[in-house]
């Protein structure tokens, strides 16, 4: 389902760089990347990013999948599955934000079905862990000013409350948890609670050793790559067996494959109680990876985003347990409100930084897999150009609002395209330096 016309020949003539012509030698990339296009305002931004910040400098073989809602509907969501399978094949995917349809969207687009979240589908196929990390600009005030370094949060995106079975209990009676083993073996029959009054509520949830182990491997790999310490948070003092299993598996994985590497890198792995960890996070300066169980990761990633200032400055990378397959995207949605203005021909000022960083993080991973130092250098220069532009006072409206508050006026910010043009100009300066 990808478009072959987006695959550029590896035998493209080399353009040598000269300051006189401002021509750039395009960086050759040996292996393909998977591109997943998206919806609404982020789809508009996505094209600007490719045309102004990526294609003029990098010669890419792109396996293109259109994950825009109309095409997902046309293919009965097969395109989403195919894009995830291609990611497993090529190891690097870069994804634009997409709509997860609700009833209103089914009506708006005339959909055949209320298709599932593309992120959920992709996550299940890749069996990955989602890592979110803020982009820090020195001049954008943070709600928690002590956070001078990023905190990268890894959320175990499987099981627990999100795959649980819950029930309302009507009246008195016994609640039991029963496990029936396959084949031989005795049934385990645990009495949970004896309801005597009007009843109440009950919940049964689970996780698997395989999934916890994958989560541990991905977390260890990310922390080592960043050369930051790793913390796992649980409540094993209360859930001695359930959370205790997370603690034990992480420790096993660490000692079996990572301890010597961590010691050589001067970093460490440590288990912490979730309440201690939240208190530590609040008073720390940042600079670590925080591995969270599913629910904790859901809550704490939003707490971090707000503390650092903005979801518009938050990257999201799905890391697979093989350590070499990733999918990079922005942590925010499709910016529908701005898209409605754009549809009417109005001016928008949409923050493209997290979408640009989806490209840089994806390409940086491709560079590491291919041992392509030139490509890695390009991604670092593009990230520095983004941050440099904001720190020089040129930014989109959302960031200007954090800076100027009620005194905000039009001269304080650039529109959507002007901001990307400013980043492109800064990038060219950095490349030709």
Curated annotation (Swiss-Prot):
Indicate the enzyme's highest-level EC class.
oxidoreductase
> For binding Mn(2+), which residues are annotated in this chain's numbering?
275, 298
Q: Cofactor(s) for this protein?
A: Mg(2+); Mn(2+)
Q: Which GO cellular component term is one of those annotated?
A: chloroplast
The answer, when asked if NADP is one of the entry's keywords, is: yes
The UniProt note on the cofactor reads as follows:
Binds 1 Mg(2+) or Mn(2+) ion per subunit.
Its tissue distribution reads: Detected in all tissues examined.
Q: Where can this protein be found?
A: Plastid, Chloroplast
Keyword annotations for this protein, in alphabetical order, are: Chloroplast, Glyoxylate bypass, Magnesium, Manganese, Metal-binding, NADP, Oxidoreductase, Plastid, Transit peptide, Tricarboxylic acid cycle
Transit peptide range?
1-21
Q: What residues does substrate bind to?
A: 100, 117-123, 132, 155
One matching Pfam family is: Iso_dh
Give the EC number(s) under which this enzyme is classified. Answer: 1.1.1.42
Q: Which domain of life is it from?
A: Eukaryota
Q: Which reaction does it catalyse?
A: D-threo-isocitrate + NADP(+) = 2-oxoglutarate + CO2 + NADPH
Q: Which SMART domains match?
A: Iso_dh (SM01329)
Q: Which family, according to the similarity comment? A: Belongs to the isocitrate and isopropylmalate dehydrogenases family.
Q: Which protein, by its recorded name, is this?
A: Isocitrate dehydrogenase [NADP], chloroplastic
State the species of origin.
Medicago sativa (Alfalfa)
């Amino acid at each position: 389902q990808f478009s072959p016309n987006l695959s550029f020949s590896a035998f493209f003539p080399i353009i040598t760089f000269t300051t006189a012509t401002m021509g750039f030698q395009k960086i050759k990339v040996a292996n393909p990347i998977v591109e997943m296009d998206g919806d609404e305002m982020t789809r508009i931004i996505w094209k600007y990013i490719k045309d102004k910040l990526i294609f003029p400098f990098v010669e890419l073989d792109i396996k293109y999948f259109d994950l825009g809602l109309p095409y997902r509907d046309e293919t009965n969501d097969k395109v989403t599955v195919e894009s995830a399978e291609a990611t497993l094949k090529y190891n690097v995917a870069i994804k634009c934000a997409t709509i997860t349809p609700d009833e209103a969207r089914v009506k708006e687009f005339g959909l055949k079905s209320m298709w599932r979240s593309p992120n959920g589908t992709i996550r299940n196929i890749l069996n990955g862990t989602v890592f979110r990390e803020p982009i820090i600009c020195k001049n954008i005030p943070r709600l928690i000013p002590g956070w001078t370094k990023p905190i990268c949060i890894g959320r175990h995106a499987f099981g627990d409350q999100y795959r649980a079975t819950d029930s309302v209990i009507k009246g008195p009676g016994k609640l039991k948890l029963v496990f029936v083993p396959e084949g031989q073996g005795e049934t385990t029959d645990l009495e949970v609670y004896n309801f005597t009054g009007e009843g109440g509520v009950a919940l049964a949830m689970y996780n698997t050793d395989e999934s916890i182990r994958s989560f541990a491997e991905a977390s260890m790999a990310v922390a080592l790559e960043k050369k930051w310490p790793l913390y796992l948070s649980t409540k094993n003092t209360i859930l001695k067996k359930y959370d205790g299993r997370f603690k034990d598996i992480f420790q096993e994985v660490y000692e079996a494959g990572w301890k010597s590497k961590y010691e050589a890198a001067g970093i460490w792995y440590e288990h912490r109680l979730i309440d201690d960890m939240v208190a530590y996070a609040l008073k720390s300066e940042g600079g670590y990876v925080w591995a969270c169980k599913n629910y904790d990761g859901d809550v704490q990633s939003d707490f971090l985003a707000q503390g650092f200032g903005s979801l518009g400055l938050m990257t999201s990378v799905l890391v697979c347990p093989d350590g070499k397959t990733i999918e990079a995207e922005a942590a925010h949605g499709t910016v529908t409100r701005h898209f409605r203005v754009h549809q009417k021909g109005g001016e928008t000022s949409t923050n493209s930084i997290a979408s640009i960083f989806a490209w840089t993080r994806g390409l940086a991973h491709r560079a590491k897999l291919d041992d392509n130092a030139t490509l890695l250098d390009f991604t670092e220069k593009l990230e520095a150009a983004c941050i440099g532009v904001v720190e020089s006072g040129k930014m989109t409206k959302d960031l200007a609002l954090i800076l100027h508050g009620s005194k905000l006026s039009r001269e304080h910010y650039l529109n959507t395209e002007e901001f990307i043009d400013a980043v492109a100009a800064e990038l060219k300066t950095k490349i030709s330096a």
